[in-house]
C-alpha cells in the first residue's frame, strides 16, 4: 500500500517520516512496524528493512549510476556478483538499459532518470518499506506525472509498503491508498482519498480539499467500470479502466449523454451515462 502524508510546510510530515526509521527519536508514543515496536529494534537492523528517498535524487555526483545503486548492498557486504545482478535487475525495472546507463555519472542523466536511479538505490537491498520525502518536488510537471505513474506501477509489482511525504493534495490523491493530513505536528485525519474528499474533517482538512473542482477530483478516483450500467450507446467505446473524469470529458467533447464501455475484449457491453456520473459526484448528504 501507499500512504501519503500531506500538509503545509512545517506541519511535521518529514519529521514523522524520519521517526519511522529512527533518524529522529519520538519523545512519546510508539511506532510499530508489522506489530513490532521499533524502539526495541537496533537502528541499523531497522534501517536495513527500510529504503529512503530524500528530496531531490541525492546521488553521489562523482559515482557512476551502478555504484550509486550499489551503495547499501556494498555496506552490507553482499558478494560482487550478487551486487552486479541486483544493479542490472533494478536498471531494467526502471527502463534504464544497463549497457547504456550503468557507467554514466548523475550529471549525464535527465531529471527523471536521476530520480529513478535514486529510487533504485533505495530499493537495492530489497527493503520491505520505502520512505519518500517529497521525491518529485523538483521535477517539471510532465516528468513528475510520469514519475508518479512509475511509482504506482512499481508498488503494484513489488507489493512493498510506501510512505510518501508531499505538500500537494493532488499528488496525495493520485498516489495514496490512504492519506494522512497533518498540521502543527498532529494527524488531523487518516482516511481513503474518497473519504478525504467526501467527508473531510472540519478546519484544515476541509480547506485543503475545498474548491469548485472537488467533484472532478472525486471522479478521478473512480474507474468507469464501477459505475457502468447495462445498456446500449452509440460511438467509440471508452475503456472500463479509465476514470469517470476521463469519461465526462469524452461525453462533453462528443456532445452525448452516454458512451459504450469496452469490456476488455473490444466489445461494447455496457454504457456510462452523464446521469450516473452526476449521481456519483453529488455531495454526500
Predicted regions located by residue number:
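ABC ATPase "signature
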Residues: 190-191, 199, 271
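Conserved catalytic motifs of ABC-family nucleotide-binding domains
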Residues: 126
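ABC ATPase NBD coupling module
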Residues: 38-51, 75, 80-81, 200
Amino acid at each position: 500500500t501507499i500512504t501519503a502524508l500531506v500538509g503545509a510546510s512545517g506541519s511535521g510530515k518529514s519529521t514523522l517520516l524520519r521517526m519511522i526509521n529512527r533518524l529522529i527519536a519520538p519523545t512519546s508514543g510508539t511506532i510499530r512496524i508489522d506489530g513490532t515496536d521499533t524502539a526495541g529494534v537496533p537502528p541499523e537492523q531497522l534501517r536495513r528493512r527500510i529504503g529512503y528517498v530524500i528530496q531531490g535524487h541525492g546521488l553521489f555526483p562523482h559515482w557512476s549510476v551502478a555504484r550509486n545503486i550499489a551503495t547499501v548492498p556494498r555496506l552490507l557486504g553482499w558478494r560482487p556478483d550478487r551486487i552486479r545482478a541486483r544493479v542490472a535487475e533494478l536498471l531494467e525495472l526502471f527502463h534504464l538499459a544497463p549497457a547504456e546507463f550503468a557507467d554514466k555519472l548523475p550529471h549525464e542523466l535527465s531529471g527523471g532518470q536521476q530520480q529513478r536511479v535514486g529510487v533504485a538505490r533505495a530499493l537495492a537491498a530489497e527493503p520491505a518499506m520505502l520512505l519518500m520525502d517529497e521525491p518529485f518536488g523538483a521535477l517539471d510537471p510532465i516528468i513528475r506525472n510520469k514519475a508518479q505513474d512509475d511509482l504506482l506501477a512499481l508498488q503494484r509489482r513489488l507489493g512493498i509498503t510506501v510512505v510518501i511525504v508531499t505538500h500537494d493534495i493532488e499528488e496525495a490523491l493520485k498516489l495514496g491508498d490512504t492519506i494522512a493530513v497533518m498540521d502543527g505536528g498532529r494527524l488531523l485525519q487518516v482516511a481513503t482519498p474518497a473519504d478525504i474528499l467526501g467527508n473531510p474533517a472540519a478546519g484544515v482538512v476541509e480547506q485543503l480539499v475545498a474548491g469548485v473542482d472537488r467533484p472532478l477530483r472525486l471522479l478521478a478516483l473512480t474507474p468507469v467500470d464501477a459505475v457502468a450500467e447495462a445498456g446500449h450507446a452509440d460511438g467509440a467505446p471508452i475503456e472500463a479502466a479509465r476514470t469517470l473524469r476521463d469519461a465526462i470529458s469524452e461525453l462533453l467533447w462528443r456532445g452525448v449523454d452516454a458512451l459504450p464501455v469496452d469490456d476488455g475484449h473490444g466489445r461494447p457491453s455496457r454504457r456510462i451515462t452523464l446521469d450516473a456520473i452526476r449521481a456519483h459526484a453529488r455531495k454526500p448528504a
